[in-house]
Regions:
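A short-motif feature that recognizes glycine-rich, charge-decorated loops
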Residues: 63-103
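Short, surface-exposed binding/anchoring microloops in extracellular/periplasmic proteins
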Residues: 43-62, 66-69
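A short, Trp-centered hydrophobic/proline-enriched beta-strand micro-motif
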Residues: 32-44
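Short, low-complexity, Pro/Ser/Thr/Gly-rich segments in the mature regions of secreted, periplasmic
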Residues: 133-146
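Bacterial signal peptide processing site
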Residues: 16-20
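Short, structured surface segments that line ligand/substrate-binding pockets
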Residues: 94-127
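Short, surface-exposed coil-to-beta transition loops
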Residues: 49-54, 127-133
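Sec-dependent bacterial lipoprotein signal peptides
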Residues: 1-14
């Protein structure tokens, strides 16, 4: 308990862009034990991301079970779930980005559920089109599947 309180206080002093803040937010998310939810996932980049974007992601029992296209650009229905994140996967994205030592990493966390709402990355300060932003919005809790 003391460790958790110390981490929250430390995160408040150092700001949410620190590694410690990400770890605190992940611990708070894990403590909620949320396994069933939906959210809208958007990737903004010049990286050739293929697939529904934005996509409505449904997670049941901690696994992506459905991905739906949200814009009418010819795509409809549901898609393969492989490659689309859960909230736990969003925290893993933060870990992978931090391991690459980017020029800038800005993460904004949800105040209620503590998931990463926005992960904005600039890998190289003076490079063009290397930035990527991952966004999770419209988070909604779902009932447990039968």
């Amino acid at each position: 308990m003391k460790r958790g309180l110390w981490m929250v206080l430390f995160a408040g002093v150092t700001g949410c862009d620190s590694i410690m803040a990400s770890e605190v937010e992940q611990e708070l998310w894990n403590a909620l034990e949320i396994r069933n939810y939906q959210f809208t996932y958007t990737v903004s980049c010049f990286c050739g991301f293929v697939g529904p974007n934005p996509a409505l992601i449904t997670v049941q029992n901690g696994a992506v079970t459905r991905v739906e296209y949200l814009r009418g650009l010819g795509g409809q229905g549901s898609y393969l779930t492989q490659g689309y994140p859960t909230v736990d996967s969003l925290f893993a994205i933060i870990d992978r980005v931090q391991a690459r030592d980017p020029a800038d990493l800005d993460v904004d966390f949800d105040d209620t559920y503590h998931f990463p709402r926005t992960i904005a990355v600039d890998y190289a300060k003076n490079a063009v089109d290397d930035e990527v932003t991952y966004t999770a919005s419209g988070f909604k809790l779902l009932a447990s599947p039968q």
